[in-house]
Amino acid sequence: MDRAAIAADSDSGLADLSIYLAAGEGKLDPSRKPDFVKKALTQDRILRLESKGKGSLVVTSCFGCGANKSWDTTLTIVWRGGKFLVAGYSRDWDWNVQKADGSVETTLGGCDINFLTGRGVASKDLDDGKPVAGKFVPIALADWSDDSRPEPCEF
């Protein structure tokens, strides 16, 4: 059985992901070093770390977490070809900006990119998601950063 853990770096406050392969069923030996560490996976608040079907690991985080300016992000990680890959990326946002005249401008949207199939959808406002142009390919988890976020997932 594999294990994963998220911990905030004491200096930066960024979330570091540690993965332990073949960790067994019992308690994890605290002296064991992780098989893989992704430093600074996200600066957002981690909501969930889940194991999904076919051996994927899903990390869900949020910025603002329901505030006037917020988004949530889901990163799907898989083990393929001897390395960890980002297989999927989803992001939903609700961004409210108070204007000088007192009105509020709201930007809603979302994206869902499957790097394994090379396809994705994006939505703006309350529209249904539409396929996005481009070919998406898996990204090594070691190379992932917020700068790797696909263009359709920007707002």
Regions found by a protein language model. Name each.
Residues 42-54:
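Beta-propeller blade termini
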Residues 14-33, 76-81:
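Beta-propeller blade repeat segments, especially FG-GAP/WD-type strand-to-loop junctions
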